[in-house]
């Protein structure tokens, strides 16, 4: 997927944004932003005053220009939001093309019926073959296939989807490139992953986050204070003018202009654009966020919990070798291990079958012909296996599982693991592999080594997270020795071994109780409770449907190291909002000292050069020139900051104190200085052109 746009704003987006800019002038839409609503009402009122005066034969160039620039202020704020929404909508339009009328091959009994994909319901079984579009979200029941997911993820390379394990989920709208798979539909039409993506990336439907609401309330409060202050100015001006034998000349357009310049219009006009663009930047990195709150939380997380299988490792553990117990033939161990795995659809189970076949030429058998009863893996027992029957009676009971589970199983049968095999188990664990034990009846036959493969480049990425102040913890169901070896190889800070869904959930709640924000990355059904509890739950797109529904973010690339980009975007969002708020308030302070001296400089003196004129440090041309210059600057600063609001300020992994000082220097001091320079330049230009 192309992460960076060659053109900052593409032509189709620009055209639609301009159209939406005027559509957003609807009073109902304007009222959603209290600060800009004040500007909107001010523009309406000054426009009404201009036309009222014109009706009575009085033409005021000043009132006309004030009205126009107030309207420009509103339009520029609308344009900023429309551009942010348009960039997200471009992604939505491409997704909607994927959601076409797909004909599904629905399995009814033993027959296949062609039905519209829109009529499929949860639990329906469909068949997809090479060249077919998958008609809806589902889980693969049988088969393995190569799937083109470029319509969803933007990546051209096909991915493998197969039954069993954590790569069984398929997404509606993707295309099967090879083989044949049987799929059980898991989502109703209208609530599929594609439908969710379309709804999530449509900026117009984005809900404000709690921080945005709080900031909006703060800005509204400041605006109310300035409104009271401006309303009191005519009384003050009238009193001062009367004492000095002068007349106050504070017209309503001047007071409205002063109010608009003092309230924080800059951040108010860009606030929605900042939030929408944060979600849009995530989309460009192939991450879908279900809420703006999740992005904000990502910028503040302290601890990252990583599920090992499929997240830190490639997920497909492979059987590498057989280690028979004393007195057991290795070929016999391989034969029994294959029997226990014939009905095991997981990649690990199939690799055991293949290893036995490749090493000893043991061919697969049909369990049903052997009256075999498959015992599926259970998260509570951590064992699976098979019961072989003869004339309805169990004659062979085979089990395979992790060390502790088999150890407990043997203990109930009055048996234990020999010291020799314990040493073998420890050796396998210390090199980062997983030992799987095989038993027949009450006899331990030996150990299978399953090798985990750590994904490349993770160590460096975790080091970057450490610089950001984020602590990484690997969570795995493996024993402590295996977990320690993999944790060291991957470069995480800590690990939690022999974890169950309950212990994952407990770990997250413990850290949250200490005041930490926790992010969890996972892909399996057993990760779902932890993903739901986490402040930031990032589900892998290759994971199960349950995991994707539980998380509040979905990584379409299924790359756990992507969290670095997620964190940076979250921090960018918070820092950009804070920086522009600082800049906006500093602007207001500067405009206050720029305008008021020009307004009241003539008071207390018949010569119109009174004591207060000394405060007019900028030596602006006139009262009207000062007001108009400030209004023009106030309007132009919004489009000038749109690129920064959309791209976000550059984030570097520095300490919080250094970042604060840097932003105060750039946006605080800059926000104080720039208005003085800008207003003075505009004032000189107005004087040169003779507009005032």
UniProtKB/Swiss-Prot annotation:
Its main location: membrane. ATP binds at residues 344, 348, 377-384, 400. Part of the high-affinity ATP-driven potassium transport (or Kdp) system, which catalyzes the hydrolysis of ATP coupled with the electrogenic transport of potassium into the cytoplasm. This subunit is responsible for energy coupling to the transport system and for the release of the potassium ions to the cytoplasm. Keywords: ATP-binding, Cell inner membrane, Cell membrane, Ion transport, Magnesium, Membrane, Metal-binding, Nucleotide-binding, Phosphoprotein, Potassium, Potassium transport, Translocase, Transmembrane, Transmembrane helix, Transport. Pfam families: E1-E2_ATPase, Hydrolase. InterPro entries: ATPase_P-typ_cyto_dom_N, ATPase_P-typ_P_site, ATPase_P-typ_TM_dom_sf, ATPase_P-typ_transduc_dom_A_sf, HAD-like_sf, HAD_sf, P-type_ATPase_bsu_IA, P_typ_ATPase. It catalyses: K(+)(out) + ATP + H2O = K(+)(in) + ADP + phosphate + H(+). One of its GO terms (cellular component) is plasma membrane. The system is composed of three essential subunits: KdpA, KdpB and KdpC. This is Potassium-transporting ATPase ATP-binding subunit. It is a multi-pass membrane protein. Its EC number is 7.2.2.6. Mg(2+) binds at residues 523, 527. It is an enzyme of class 7 (translocase). It comes from the Bacteria. SUPFAM superfamilies: Calcium ATPase, transduction domain A, Calcium ATPase, transmembrane domain M, HAD-like.
